[in-house]
Amino acid sequence: MPKVRTKDLIEQFHLELISGEEGIHRPIDTSDLSRPGIEMAGFFTYYPADRVQLLGKTELTFFDTLTSDQKQERMKALCTEETPCIIVTRNQDVPDELLQASRESGMPLLRSSQTTTRLSSRLTNYLEGKLAPTTAVHGVLVDIYGVGVLITGQSGVGKSETALELVKRGHRLVADDSVEIRQEDEDMLVGSSPDLIEHLLEIRGLGIINVMTLFGAGAVRNYKRITLVINLEIWDQKKNYDRLGLDEEKMKIIDTELTKITLPVRPGRNLAVIIEVAAMNFRLKRMGVNAAQQFSERLMSAIELGNQE
């Protein structure tokens, strides 16, 4: 099922429907837009018919210089069965040839009061957000000191309980149990909650609680960029865990690699505090302050100094 149809653009941007009402359910499969200037001159070899077409002042001014036969020919070529719609910007008058071609092909012809550049920018942002690659991950997403932390781990390891403690400490819940993730840009993953379980948290033995009702609107947010993954696992005596923080694990989601920290879970460990510190330490590293690296350098300097003596 298509994520975006022409009718969605009409509703989102309050576009005026001039003709082609029967085609408003046409799918839009790309966030790329087209301003068919070269096509107005008659070159249709590489015409991207599957894109939303924008006709601005430049295109229509040139169109006025064409002969009557050329106008009809160009507009018929523009209005294909594949084209989602044509949008005339700046509330300009719609040429009769375009109106006729739209009616014959059933292609939606729309009009906007916005400038071409402004509308193009808004359309691109909207379509990129809607058409971005998506996936779902089992875990909890929390905003901790401005860092989007995705907490993962096996079922029953304590993800939701840890998230509840983090919310009590003033941080904000984004999603629990199922995190919908979309890649809005290169190296940019944004997580949100499915509508059905938005603002809800499931605690074993307690049931489902509404975080916004209990803790207020400041305890939740609708979406957050994910920059850090913390994986909780039951403590394994045979496994060697990182004690210095020099080695950095990575986890790939869609086409983006994220920093991953594995935290062993055992009785007596305050996971909420550890995750808080992990988020703060992650921010420090991004600012160029790496405590583990500094310790390693001091240690090497001390060893070299000892060898010289």
From Swiss-Prot:
Q: Where is this region: Important for the catalytic mechanism of dephosphorylation?
A: 264-269
Q: Name one GO molecular function term.
A: protein serine/threonine/tyrosine kinase activity
Q: What does the record give as the active site?
A: H138, K159, D177 (proton acceptor), R243
Q: Which residues are recorded as binding Mg(2+)?
A: S160, E202
One of this protein's GO BP terms? Answer: regulation of carbohydrate metabolic process
Enzymatic reactions: [HPr protein]-L-serine + ATP = [HPr protein]-O-phospho-L-serine + ADP + H(+); [HPr protein]-O-phospho-L-serine + phosphate + H(+) = [HPr protein]-L-serine + diphosphate
Keyword terms of this UniProt record: ATP-binding, Carbohydrate metabolism, Kinase, Magnesium, Metal-binding, Multifunctional enzyme, Nucleotide-binding, Serine/threonine-protein kinase, Transferase
Region entry Important for the catalytic mechanism of both phosphorylation and dephosphorylation, spans: 201-210
Gene3D superfamilies recorded for this chain? HprK N-terminal domain-like, P-loop containing nucleotide triphosphate hydrolases
InterPro entries cross-referenced by the UniProt entry: HPr(Ser)_kin/Pase (IPR003755), Hpr_kin/Pase_C (IPR011104), Hpr_kin/Pase_Hpr_N (IPR011126), P-loop_NTPase (IPR027417), Ser_kin/Pase_Hpr-like_N_sf (IPR028979)
Q: Does the keyword Metal-binding apply?
A: yes
Q: Does the keyword Transferase apply?
A: yes
Residue numbers binding ATP: G153, Q154, S155, G156, V157, G158, K159, S160
Q: What is its EC number?
A: 2.7.11.-, 2.7.4.-
Transmembrane feature ranges:
none
What protein family is recorded? Belongs to the HPrK/P family.
> Could you describe the subunit structure of this protein?
Homohexamer.
Reproduce the miscellaneous comment text. Answer: Both phosphorylation and phosphorolysis are carried out by the same active site and suggest a common mechanism for both reactions.
State the protein's purpose. Catalyzes the ATP- as well as the pyrophosphate-dependent phosphorylation of a specific serine residue in HPr, a phosphocarrier protein of the phosphoenolpyruvate-dependent sugar phosphotransferase system (PTS). HprK/P also catalyzes the pyrophosphate-producing, inorganic phosphate-dependent dephosphorylation (phosphorolysis) of seryl-phosphorylated HPr (P-Ser-HPr).
Q: What is this protein called?
A: HPr kinase/phosphorylase
Q: Which organism is it from?
A: Bacillus cereus (strain AH820)
